């Protein structure tokens, strides 16, 4: 996928909040481009949800991220929840 894209970020977030959201986006990318521990992705998702508690905002960011990257936040989280332990890979 094209690695020259911008993440959907809210510039009103603090540095720590930006780091949490970016960590989650990076873990989703890792799930598609290689492998990532399911627990690591779920932990970063918890950090993301602490910053973005609203389901509608999560969906909006997910759509924007998928549009620019081709990677689905939802599918990555669902795969991690189903796997529980071990690594997940969503790459083709």
UniProtKB/Swiss-Prot annotation:
Alphabetical list of SUPFAM superfamilies matching this protein: BH2638-like
Pfam families in the cross-refs: UPF0223
Domain of life: Bacteria
UniProt xrefs under Gene3D superfamilies: BH2638-like
Database matches in InterPro entries: BH2638-like_sf (IPR023324), UPF0223 (IPR007920)
Family indicated by similarity: Belongs to the UPF0223 family.
Name of the protein described by the UniProt record: UPF0223 protein SPCG_1392
């Amino acid at each position: 996928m094209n690695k020259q894209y911008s993440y959907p970020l809210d510039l009103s977030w603090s540095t720590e909040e930006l780091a949490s959201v970016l960590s989650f986006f990076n873990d989703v990318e890792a799930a598609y481009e290689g492998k990532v521990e399911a627990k690591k992705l779920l932990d970063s998702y918890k950090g993301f949800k602490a910053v973005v508690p609203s389901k509608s905002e999560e969906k909006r960011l997910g759509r924007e991220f998928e549009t620019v990257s081709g990677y689905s936040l939802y599918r990555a989280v669902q795969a991690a929840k189903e796997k529980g332990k071990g690594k997940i890979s969503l790459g083709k």
